[in-house]
């Protein structure tokens, strides 16, 4: 299966004072027979095929039409410790803790699964918690840091600690089913661009890597994209999700351009007006 890079390329730009050393995330290694991999793949179900997005609030001319949701719920996943040792990462659990701190500061009720607790069943339970919690007028968020890979025939997937491929169609069928029209979705993982194809009305989605690698910043104990995103919202006044995503993208691209490397962070904005987190 295709995942992140199979080589841990280390970059330490002399003039890159923000991130210091950057490490390319290693490839998700899966030597199981394809039949077994297929049995460890979760894909969209017909159960959610009749979903219709809730009607968004009216456009206010550029501001956030729902700046003060009645309730806010965030489900956060960070996986550095995978089954076995071949696929372990370094800072994804730190990414999750930093995301938790930020979302808590914004008034969110948090549910979080880290490392070996983030099984496929746990992620499904967490996504169902978002669906069960959300009501019209509420806001939800999902944030993931860990391995991303391509599932044969199903495209971009995130990987649970017990090595299930959670495909973009499967994850988004839950997220899109939440009965509210203010939704924030972030992935710090490799090759997760297919998730944007499922981005529904009311959602602001930001991805660290559409079709290339993601990177870690060991000196800062973060994924590079997560570092820039947190830096934007906490230190540079990026209170709107669109601005935070743009700030993170610009930071990664500016660094990569110094070394003629290609990175592909991007965002898809289907929220009406500006998204005040």
Go through the PLM ranges and name each one.
Residues 5-141, 220-223, 276:
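Boundary/activation segment at the start of structured domains
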Residues 122, 147-178, 239:
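A short, glycine/acidic-enriched catalytic loop
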Residues 1-2:
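Sec-dependent bacterial lipoprotein signal peptides
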Residues 94, 98-105, 118, 122-129, ...:
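Extracytoplasmic/secreted proteins, especially bacterial periplasmic and envelope-associated proteins
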Residues 183-269, 275-276:
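Active-site-proximal C-terminal subdomain of hydrolase catalytic domains
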Residues 86-89, 152-156, 196-198:
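Short, solvent-exposed loop/turn and secondary-structure capping segments
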Residues 75-80, 113-118, 143-148, 160-163, ...:
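Active-site-proximal beta-strand/loop segments in catalytic clefts of secreted hydrolases
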